[in-house]
């Protein structure tokens, strides 16, 4: 509808110029917005006002010229009005909205899809938590955001590659090994002074007990450095296996788990730094190697190899991001915790230094989650230093509720997550509110089959469709027509919460309609038209939930 109206306005402006009613032939992009108030129409444009300087005319005169030359060959306009200094308000004929129902029934699960990506390849790297402990709630929000962004981009024509970067080569892995070894020594009866910089959680003791049961004799024969490395390897593998299971339970899978250690072992880090040194962006100073990130917009240069010969985490990140583009991705999206915001300029600098546009990298920063129970804060960590895990939250409220709530606000805003609210079977629970629409319509269709012998409603003629004339019905159809734009905007701006917001609006529209009107009536024609409408609602609810990674239950 919006595209049709934009074309009509563009044609009207051109016609007005050709007939001398306007002075310039070029016009800015035509923006159409849905007015806040119903009496301002279905769409409004400020084209006349933003064209005033070019046309050298009063905005209201421009608006009058455009309206006078509107050709409504499709018969979609009920009326137009010029408001205020030059806004043009468009009122769409109610029946002009109805064809969207046919599109939904024809496209089904593809309704709302587009070709925004044009088949280009995009890599979405998300979660990428260190294999030094279980995933916590913050990781869960990042996981939901990253996976939903990937789903939306794939739906909009991108070839999407999901990747988890395993940080298995840094000092944190040695610290993990030392932590486990010290806990193992405690199990063996040794007095141990456990350092504060070691990992404190009870999961470390659990791993130590397992190693003691399976590898005690071998460990007793090892020198300290070998024992640390052994414990680190066993612990990291076990933790990573747990992360994989937790993410699978959260309906998240990856195309690739990329090892940081592989970059070191294959010489990719060393080779990348050598090439950058040849180009002059990596230089030696004070016995260390520095990357001249300040040349690319960072506030200062960064160390990539310390004066003791040890590569920094940033060195691996440079090699990793170069590797991403070497694999042929047109675009790379990283999903990080908000505490990494200061890291963006240096990674952008690395992208520029390896010959890519910094715009080829998008970084999504995900803010923190505060857990609540009936409105009261829940302690996010125990005395032992363990954060509330994603697994614990998923086990308590379910993956669907967790994912929906994680996506219920823009990721750049902190999120309050009420565990009790997420379990309620009431309209106060947003995921229940949306899923119940799907389940209620499924129940309605079952009743239609049992009581009226009406099977799946797949086709309704236009005459029958025009029986949908109640204001709430037309409003519901208008909401359905908004879905493709919600999807394309979510893809364009990498904002999955737009889908969540849309689904809540659609659910509210359906609940309001259902409370006022019976779908299964004594009038067979009206019943068929209304079933056709609610089937479309059911399909769009299912489509939107799928983009969030949330199920659409047939019963609740």
UniProtKB/Swiss-Prot annotation:
As recorded in UniProt, its EC number(s) are: 6.1.1.19
Q: Which domain of life is it from?
A: Bacteria
Q: Which InterPro entries match?
A: aa-tRNA-synth_I_CS, Arg-tRNA-ligase, Arg-tRNA-synth_N, Arg-tRNA-synth_N_sf, ArgRS_core, DALR_anticod-bd, Rossmann-like_a/b/a_fold, tRNAsynth_Ia_anticodon-bd
Reply yes or no: does the keyword Metal-binding apply: no
Annotated SMART domains: Arg_tRNA_synt_N, DALR_1
Where in or outside the cell? Cytoplasm
Q: Name one GO biological process term.
A: arginyl-tRNA aminoacylation
- Sequence motif 'HIGH' region, residues: 129-139
Q: Name one GO molecular function term.
A: arginine-tRNA ligase activity
Q: Which GO terms describe its cellular component?
A: cytoplasm
CDD domains reported for this sequence = Anticodon_Ia_Arg, ArgRS_core
NCBIfam families the UniProt entry points to = argS
Q: What does the sequence similarity comment in the record state about its family?
A: Belongs to the class-I aminoacyl-tRNA synthetase family.
Record-given protein name: Arginine--tRNA ligase
According to its UniProt entry, this protein's organism is Desulfosudis oleivorans (strain DSM 6200 / JCM 39069 / Hxd3)
